[in-house]
């Protein structure tokens, strides 16, 4: 019985090292690029290998053997659908290792957002400084006129002293905001200048291109580079997971909340998919502190009060941090002081006239000192009211929009239920 002859074709693989496949092939064909023709009798166990045209992804490590001989296999487009963004490796022993650079590295760690946030904090520093200077400028005349006004015009020191206390409170609030803004600005700047940023940029650049993934044989050096990049990314996999948890905790701290269920953790992980990066434990700790300092909402509550209600809604009743409670209280305190201030200030002009009568003066002939100090105190009151209205208006507007939205949703839900009942 005649046996048909079969050929075995060996292709040149350039500088790509594919252990242990290349070792087995080169052991039989020492001259690369040579086509060796053998009979079936000489190699009864060898089957013909035909090259695949434009394979999608190369299976570098394959455990498919034919009598202790390993061959290079090709992963088709069906396999690529299983891992759209990465490469599939089958290591000896049948264990499939899947790494996807874009899955772990993400599209981009948004360093630009940090820079923009830092610029925003810088604008806050300027705005808070102006506010601090304004109230400090009012503090000086109020303090200077306090004692003469009390002696000449006011039998009870309520109005002038209360005006002074309000200014001191607003200065304290502006001072805290200014200090935290400066601290955050410096910490974020220090992080942006740290080696961690270079490490992030290097890893983000280690993503194989679509051309290399689509036709690896077209550029073997690029294929080898992409394999190396993938291995490097895989080494950082556990570090990325640890950092993801750290950044996720920072995000929860932003909203003054704590994650309390696995579903919420999954949602946070989805939001942070593109914000993972490699770093060692020291850099991760430094990054965590920098981001936490940056995202402390203390200065944002005073400058952008509409965030207060947003985060309250986002927490869904979860426990707020002590800092969030403190800032929320500081936002409410001026509103309460305004009410008391108006009540006290409205009766002050009568008290001034009564005091002038006791001094033997004409109640209709009010001294200039009394008029100037009284007007200054009312100016402080008006400015305090305007400042708090400006800061509280977005919160009230947001609350009204939320109520209106809830009413519409409830109405639509009821209408849908009525339609179902009619059907």
From Swiss-Prot:
One of its GO terms (cellular component) is membrane. The chain crosses the membrane at residues 125-145, 162-182, 326-346, 366-386. Its main location: host cell. Residues 43-57 have a biased composition (Basic and acidic residues). It is found in: Host membrane. Residues 67-84 have a biased composition (Acidic residues). Residues 43-91, 253-282 are annotated as: Disordered. It is a multi-pass membrane protein. It comes from the Viruses. This is Putative transmembrane protein ORF103. It comes from Ostreid herpesvirus 1 (isolate France) (OsHV-1).
């Amino acid at each position: 019985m005649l046996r048909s002859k079969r050929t075995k074709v060996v292709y040149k693989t350039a500088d790509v090292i594919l252990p242990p496949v290349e070792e087995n092939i080169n052991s039989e064909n020492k001259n690369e690029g040579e086509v060796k023709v053998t009979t079936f009798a000489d190699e009864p166990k060898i089957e013909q290998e035909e090259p695949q045209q434009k394979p999608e992804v190369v299976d570098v490590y394959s455990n498919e053997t034919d009598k202790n001989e390993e061959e290079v296999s090709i992963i088709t487009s069906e396999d690529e659908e299983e891992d759209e963004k990465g490469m599939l490796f089958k290591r000896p022993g049948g264990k499939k290792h899947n790494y996807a650079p874009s899955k772990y590295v993400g599209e981009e760690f948004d360093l630009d957002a940090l820079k923009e946030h830092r610029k925003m904090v810088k604008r806050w520093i300027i705005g808070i400084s102006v506010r601090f200077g304004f109230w400090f400028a009012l503090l000086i005349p109020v303090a200077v006129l306090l004692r003469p006004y009390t002696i000449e015009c006011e039998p009870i020191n309520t109005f002038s002293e209360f005006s002074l206390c309000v200014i001191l409170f607003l200065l304290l609030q502006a001072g805290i905001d200014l200090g935290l803004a400066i601290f955050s600005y410096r910490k974020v700047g220090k992080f942006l200048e740290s080696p961690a940023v270079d490490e992030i940029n290097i890893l983000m650049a280690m993503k194989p291109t679509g051309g290399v993934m689509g036709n690896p044989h077209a550029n073997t050096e690029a294929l080898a580079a992409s394999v190396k990049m993938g291995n490097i990314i895989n080494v950082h996999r556990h570090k990325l997971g640890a950092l993801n948890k750290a950044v996720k905790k920072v995000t929860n701290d932003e909203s003054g909340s704590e994650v309390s269920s696995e579903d919420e953790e999954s949602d946070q992980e989805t939001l942070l998919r593109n914000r993972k990066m490699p770093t060692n434990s020291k850099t991760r700790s430094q990054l965590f502190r920098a981001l936490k300092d940056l995202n402390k909402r203390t200065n944002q509550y005073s400058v952008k009060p509409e965030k207060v209600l947003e985060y309250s809604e986002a927490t869904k009743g979860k426990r707020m941090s002590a800092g969030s409670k403190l800032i929320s209280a500081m936002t409410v305190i001026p509103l309460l002081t305004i009410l008391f201030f108006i009540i006290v200030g409205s009766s002050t002009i009568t008290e001034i006239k009564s005091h002038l009568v006791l001094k033997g003066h004409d109640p209709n002939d009010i001294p200039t000192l009394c008029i100037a100090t009284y007007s200054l105190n009312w100016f402080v009151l008006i400015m305090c009211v305007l400042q708090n209205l400006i800061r509280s208006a977005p919160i009230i507007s947001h609350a009204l929009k939320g109520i209106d939205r809830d009413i519409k949703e409830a109405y639509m839900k009821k209408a849908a239920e009525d339609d179902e009942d009619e059907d």
